[in-house]
Amino acid sequence: MKYRDLRDFLSLLEQRGELKRISQPIDPYLEMTEIADRTLRAGGPALLFENPKGYSMPVLCNLFGTAKRVAMGMGQEDVSALRDVGKLLAFLKEPDPPKGFRDLFDKLPKFKQVLNMPTKRLNSAPCQEQVWQGEDVDLSRIPVMHCWPEDAAPLVSWGLTITRGPHKERQNLGIYRQQVLGKNKLIMRWLSHRGGALDYQEWCEAHPGERFPVAVALGADPATILAAVTPVPDTLSEYAFAGLLRGHKTEVVKCLSNDLEVPASAEIVLEGYIEQGDMAPEGPYGDHTGYYNEIDNFPVFTVTHITQRQDAIYHSTYTGRPPDEPAVMGVALNEVFVPILQKQFPEIVDFYLPPEGCSYRLAVVTIKKQYAGHAKRVMMGVWSFLRQFMYTKFVIVCDDDINARDWNDVIWAITTRMDPSRDTVLIENTPIDYLDFASPVSGLGSKMGLDATNKWPAETPREWGRPIKMDEDVRARIDALWDELAIFSDKDAKR
C-alpha cells in the first residue's frame, strides 16, 4: 500500500469505508473524546470532524483505532504482514552476512528496500505554505482537544517531536504529550530515558544556558508517525525507517528558525526552543492507564513559529482505560516485536502484550523450553533486550502448547504449572513508568516474572502431570458422526 502523505492516506481510507466525515458541530471539549471512544470500542472508522465548535480547522481522530489501519499505515494490507516488518527490523538491527551467492540473491529484496532509507531534502514544502511568527503565533487557533473533565488544560497528543543532540548527526523523533500553557507555550512531557529528553540533557551539558531547538510536527504521514513508536535500531533514523515502510524516501524541509528537518507534508509544524531551567507543573491528565496521573514538572516549549499547509487538518487522539489508540497500536506492533525477539531468542514461539495490560505492562511469552531455568532467562531477556519493555512489570512464560493470546490457556498454565514460591521471580528497584502510581517511588518499582512452564527434573523432585488428551482415532470417528448426532440445532456449532 503506497501513499505520500496524511491526505493521501485519508483518501485511501475513505475509498475503503475506513473514514467517516462528521459535519455536525462537535466540541473539542470532551465531546470529541466521547464520540471517538465509542467509535473505537466498536471497531469503527477514523473520524474527521469537519466543523469543530469555535474553529475552522478540521480534527482527525481514531486514525489508528483498529489494528488493520495501523498495518495500512505501515504499508501493509493486514496485521499478519507486520511480521515481515519485524523481520526487516531484525535484519537491520543485526544483519547476517550472505553465506553464498544464493543467499545473497535471497537477501537482495532487503537491500533494495534499504535504498529507500535516505531522506529527500526539499527547498520548499507544503508544511510552510502559511507562516505565523512572533506576536502572530497563537496556539488557540488550533482545535486542541480537552479530553477528560479533570484534565488541567487542552492537550496536544500526537506531537511528533524532532530534536538533535549536540554530538549526533541524525535527529530523534518521539511522540510526547504537550499541555497548552499559553498562546505560544506548551509543556513538553518527556521521560528522562526518551530520546528527546536525552538530547536535551546532552545539550544542557554541552551548551550551558543556550536555548535548545525543538520542532513539533502535527499531522505527519502515518509511516513517519509509526516509525517514531517502533523499535528502530539506534543506528537507523525514524525518517529512514518511514521511507522503508512507505516505499519511497521521506521528504523533509529545514525549519525556518533552526536547522532541524521536519516532514515536508506535515499539516502543522511548531518551531521554537526550550529555555534551560524553564519548567512548569504538568497535569493532571487522564492517561492510558484509565486514571488521572500525578502532577510533575517538565520543560516549557516556547513556540516562535507556526507553519502549516493550506486548509490544515489537526490530528488528535485521547488516552484512557484500554482499549484506546495506544492499546490498539500495541496489538499491531506486537507482531513487529516477535521476529526481533526471535532473532535474539530463537526459542520464543510467540510474544503477546494484552491490550488490557495498558499496552506494555504485562507480557506473555511462549517458548520451546530446552533446559531447567530457561523461563527465567527469557524473562531477563525480555526486560533487557528492547527499551520498549523497560516498563513491563509482569512477564509470564509458558510452554509452546499454550496459546499466549488465549487467557483460558494462560490462566490454566499459571494455576497448574506454578508453585508461587518456587516459580515467582521478584526484582526490586527497577525503572517503572512515571505514570504508574502503584509503584512505591515515582519512576522506581519492582517487576514480577511467572514461570508457568512444565518443570524439568532439576526443577522439581516430583512426578510431573501429563495433560489429558483424547485418542486421535476416537476424535476422527466422532468428527465423522457429529453432524448426524444433531446435538445442536446449528450444525456449525463449536465442537
From Swiss-Prot:
Pathway(s) the chain acts in: Cofactor biosynthesis; ubiquinone biosynthesis
Active-site feature positions: D287 (proton donor)
Swiss-Prot/TrEMBL cofactor(s): prenylated FMN; Mn(2+)
Subcellular location: Cell membrane
Residues that bind Mn(2+): N172, E238
Similarity-based family: Belongs to the UbiD family.
Record note on quaternary structure: Homohexamer.
Protein name: 3-octaprenyl-4-hydroxybenzoate carboxy-lyase
Species assigned in the record: Yersinia pseudotuberculosis serotype O:1b (strain IP 31758)
